[in-house]
Amino acid sequence: MISTTTHSVEGHEITDYVGIVNGEAIMGANVVRDFLAGISDVIGGRSAAYEDKLAEGRQIAVREMEDRAAQLGADAVVGVMLDFETLRDGMLMCVATGTAVKLRRRS
């Protein structure tokens, strides 16, 4: 499955717009990691724990979005956007949204 933030796929023509698809991931962060991330932020370093959580959430959300597109018979998802939100109690939500399309290779 091709996923792209652009509105076209190089070397292909979009033959059908199947619909809007999305995927979500809600991740928990533990208290020790939150505390250590806070120390890292105060010192001015990067928080690897949060970066890892963001990457994991992104992968899950994109995979779920692609699975939904495949269920609709799509070849690709274009115009992909990612959104991250911090929820209460240390929860992190990642949402991937895009348009599922059918493609034909240009000759």
UniProtKB/Swiss-Prot annotation:
The domain of life is: Bacteria
InterPro entries linked: UPF0145_dom_sf, UPF0145_YbjQ-like
Report any Pfam family annotated for this entry. YbjQ_1
Q: Which Gene3D superfamilies match?
A: Hypothetical protein apc22750. Chain B
**SUPFAM superfamilies named among the record's database cross-references:** YbjQ-like
The family classification in the record reads: Belongs to the UPF0145 family.
- PANTHER family with a match to the protein in the record: UPF0145 PROTEIN YBJQ
Q: What is this protein called?
A: UPF0145 protein BH1111
